[in-house]
Amino acid sequence: MADESKPPSATANAKKPRKRFIGSKSATPSKPGTSSSTIIAHQIPEDILSDALLNDAIKQLPSNYSFEIHKTIHHVRKNAATMVGLQLPEGLQMFACVIADIIERFTNALAVIMGDVTYGACCIDDYTAVALGCDMMVHYGHSCLVPMDQTKIKTLYVFVEIAVDSNHLAQTIRLNFPNNRQRFHESLLDSEETDSQIPTGQIIGKSRHLRIEAASAEESAAHGNGTGSTPSAEPTRLALVSTIQFVAALQQLKEDITAEDVAVANRPAGLLEDSVAHESTGNEVGNSPPLVWSGKYEATIPRSKPLSPGEILGCTAPRLGDVDALVYLGDGRFHLESIMIANPTVPAFRYDPYSKKLTRERYDHGEMRTVRDQAVQTARQSIEALPASRPSLVAHKDAPPLWGVILGTLGRQGSFRQLQAITNQLSSSRTPIPFIPILLSELSPSKLALFNPHISTFVQTSCPRLSIDWGYAFDKPLLSPYETAVAVGKAVGWMDKQDGAEGGIYPMDFYAAGSPWAISRAKAVF
């Protein structure tokens, strides 16, 4: 319904379908051979790109890391910034001084290095940058999780894309993963059931080491040029994911392994089982180099909006369709564990682009679900101990313990609207739950133990992985927003809905578009 206060012309225009592209308008159309002002504003001027001194300074940074220095200099000059805050995760802080020196040398701005810990894109600290007097900040190493129009300061996101050896990556996949789906399950997955039945502590001997076989010479000759599969064989289905630094490499990998009958070199690229190397026994026929699978794979790059295709966070990962395995490109396990939790039945592999090793990764889903369910049940017991009427918040010796609702203050980790949604949920519960808001930048067992015995349960809005990974270390239940909804009966728990032999699915959708937790950050309701 149109606003009656608007003039008729405005009301009429409001009924017209909206254009999909909305940009700056020009009084006259641009002539051929000229660029619009909008395009020029976003292009890096040639004098910056060809600045010999600037290019020499950039050489002080690793060439395989894209810090987008030219773009940064352009934006600092364009915004006439006088003080620029630089926020980098700990893994990139070794380059902070060089970047700051370049900015101060080639612009009129001062650079401030924001040294507080940065765990992810949710930790962008525009509030501190403003308090320091900055009029612009550059956030490195993470995607634009907090939109630029919501920050309190002009913000430039630099993903820091990292170049990888795409040829080695593709050949490693082709050496270790048969492109024939049946052969993939027989040689990789089915043997895991046999290995899992070996008693703990039994000496299995050298003959029991992992050995993934490629196509034999006879098979290669029969099937043509080392493809290792018949034309009618179903291809192995792989889901490819990574952090934002390697999403471009995912696209290249998909192109490389979905091509049919590619020419590949017989270059070994060994597989590590659970991060333990397995050496060759030397009993291979003729000690010939292993053959690779040169056939076509079926590769998908899943997406959980608003993230980029293939990008996953420690708290947000998509549910996968029918795939035989997932391949994670990146170092460490934090992000990988997110998609493993969301897809407990999908075998997971990790390719580390730094060590160039491929490992089979596992996660104890049963233990995680049990530990988190115990926290929820303990929280429910504290609710059952409350009086049916609204309890008083006035402290006295017989007062029931409160729930502490923690608003994370490390960057943008905590959302005040989400805090409102949670407190409204507690107040409107069948048994109203007394609570007290708590502001904390970082949580620790010793810090929360100081609130004993007045608080029976903590709810934290900082990061779901704090509860999943470290909840067992706290004296009192430390619930995420999702677990809180389960505890008060507003959401179906992972233990309530059985989905296969391993139980229900624990969702990893904290920032996924349309999830209750994403909606609460925008509307203060679930």
Q: What residue ranges belong to the model's regions?
A:
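Metallocofactor- and cofactor-centric catalytic cores in central/energy metabolism, strongly enriched
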Residues: A2-G133, H139-G141, V146, K447
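N-terminal glycine-rich phosphate/adenylate-binding segment common to multiple enzyme folds
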Residues: A2-P7, T11, K16-F21, E90, ...
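Short helix-loop-beta junction
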Residues: D101-A109, D256-N266, P289-Y297, T345-P347, ...
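Redox- and metal-dependent alpha/beta enzyme cores, enriched for Fe-S-associated oxidoreductases
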Residues: L253, H335-F435, E442-A449
